[in-house]
Amino acid sequence: MDFDELYKKILHHYEQAKKSLDKIEKTMLEHSALSDVVPGYNADFLEFESYQEDNFTVLFVDMRKSTRRAKKIGGKKTFLSMHAYIPAMLEIISYHQGKVIDIMGDGIMAFWGGKKSGLIKKNAVRKAGMCGLDMIKAMEKVVNPILKKDGIEWEIDIGVGIAYGNVIVTKIGIEQFYDVKAF
């Protein structure tokens, strides 16, 4: 992983977020949720009240003590921090060919493998493991230096968990509102 290149990309995301601070208004913004993203599965071909089983390597990353940190540093610095941290993690997942399943607050879930991927267990686990290591390195070499340079002294600390195993893929919700999820 080229951390110098990652630094440039994340600095760009961060600078864009800084520029938008003055423009943010207290209005509801339209968002599109990550949906229908479990690799190899499509909501159109899944039925409610049914499921399929598959094997994936799952990576979950989240910030440690993020609520305490946010209370201490305030809204603007938390906003800027998230616009350095989340894009960095997503860039690294993309680099290691993972599939982002969900972004939940300051946590991100990504998958490797699955029956339809052609990726064997050993390689899926290796890719996820290398991704996790690069995430930890990126905090030290990219994200925290960008924040510190801008006067945000409280460094972001992350935890990364990786597991391989059987998951249940299902279409869950009601006709108007549903998602494809893996448990």
Q: What do the PLM-derived regions correspond to, one by one?
A:
Residues 86-119:
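Conserved helix-loop-beta segment at the catalytic/binding core of cyclic-nucleotide signaling proteins
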Residues 67-70, 112, 171:
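Activation segment
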Residues 115-183:
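Catalytic beta-strand-to-alpha-helix segment of the class III nucleotidyl cyclase homology domain
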Residues 64, 104, 165:
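Anionic group-transfer/hydrolysis microenvironments
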Residues 57-59, 99, 135, 168:
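Protein kinase-like catalytic core scaffold
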Residues 1-87, 91-96:
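Juxtacatalytic helix/coil linker segments
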Residues 70, 78, 100-102, 120, ...:
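Short, surface-exposed helix-loop/turn micro-motifs enriched in polar/charged residues
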Residues 55-58, 107, 155-159:
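Broad gene-expression machinery/nucleic-acid interaction feature
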